[in-house]
């Protein structure tokens, strides 16, 4: 199989973790007889510095012609004083909108060998395997008008939470489709006791549920969902929610695992390349030191192989390699115990590559 991958290293540790991920992808390609080609492009702060905009048109074009997109991280304090439309994060929002990446998938899995990294008790997190499906191109982050009006103490500010019924239906249906190949349980998260948009969301969820009689649908208010993710995360299979709620809940759920450095994500559309990225930030404080955790980016590559390329065995090979490396005791500083020796980005990447090369031939 031949595939072209757009690589957007971005800012901070982004170039380091994407380089590590490319090494792993190349090991998979060599191992299974595939050909992956890579084309790098600018996004975020580095794009602002070089061409004056966080999302150059050339980058959008490279992504549109790719089979999959790998992103490192964007942003950093260097660009925090810029106007909102010139911030690095605006480039990522524009990329999502430009490629119609409406479905964000955030898997949360607790590795047995990393159970101690979580601040929660082992009996609470043991066996956690949930998936948050977040709507990504609507809601408060994109709704108009978005403005300030008036001045002084009577100055008003307006943000708009806007969705169409169709936008709700496509993301909820995606959650049900994913639940069909998991444990057939969907928790729809809303604020239907207050928000009109949530009341319509709940209506649409009930309509979609009729198409999937094998799947159990549960409605949960967002404040309760936030509590339950910490209190009893094992109850969840697939959670689906709108943009703002999903942004908050997915970061909360990430701490069930103990480190943002372990969690991948996928942003998908109905027809076009998916975007795959770690959920951690650009971590400029450790950029260039060779200590960044590459495992979330590597795991994001496994999601690319699965969801964009249909290469499920290859994806599992990466996932198994990550598990094997953790069992061997490799740890970057973010997941190491106090006083425990930590591994470099290169050491962990090399170990994952070796584990892939040593895997049983299933091609």
Curated annotation (Swiss-Prot):
GO terms for cellular component: cytosol. Binds 1 Mg(2+) or Mn(2+) ion per subunit. Its cofactor is Mg(2+); Mn(2+). Pathway: Amino-acid biosynthesis; L-leucine biosynthesis; L-leucine from 3-methyl-2-oxobutanoate: step 3/4. The keyword Metal-binding applies. Mg(2+) binds at residues 223, 247, 251. Keywords: Amino-acid biosynthesis, Branched-chain amino acid biosynthesis, Cytoplasm, Leucine biosynthesis, Magnesium, Manganese, Metal-binding, NAD, Oxidoreductase. Substrate binds at residues 96, 106, 134, 223. It comes from the Bacteria. The record marks 141, 191 as: Important for catalysis. It is found in: Cytoplasm. Pfam families: Iso_dh (PF00180). One of its GO terms (biological process) is L-leucine biosynthetic process. One of its GO terms (molecular function) is magnesium ion binding. Its EC number is 1.1.1.85. InterPro entries: IsoCit/isopropylmalate_DH_CS, IsoPropMal-DH-like_dom, Isopropylmalate_DH. Signal peptide: none annotated. NAD(+) binds at residues 76-89, 281-293. It catalyses: (2R,3S)-3-isopropylmalate + NAD(+) = 4-methyl-2-oxopentanoate + CO2 + NADH. Gene3D superfamilies: Isopropylmalate Dehydrogenase. Catalyzes the oxidation of 3-carboxy-2-hydroxy-4-methylpentanoate (3-isopropylmalate) to 3-carboxy-4-methyl-2-oxopentanoate. The product decarboxylates to 4-methyl-2 oxopentanoate. Homodimer. HAMAP family: LeuB_type1 (MF_01033). Belongs to the isocitrate and isopropylmalate dehydrogenases family. LeuB type 1 subfamily. This is 3-isopropylmalate dehydrogenase. The lineage of its organism: Bacteria, Bacillati, Bacillota, Bacilli, Bacillales.
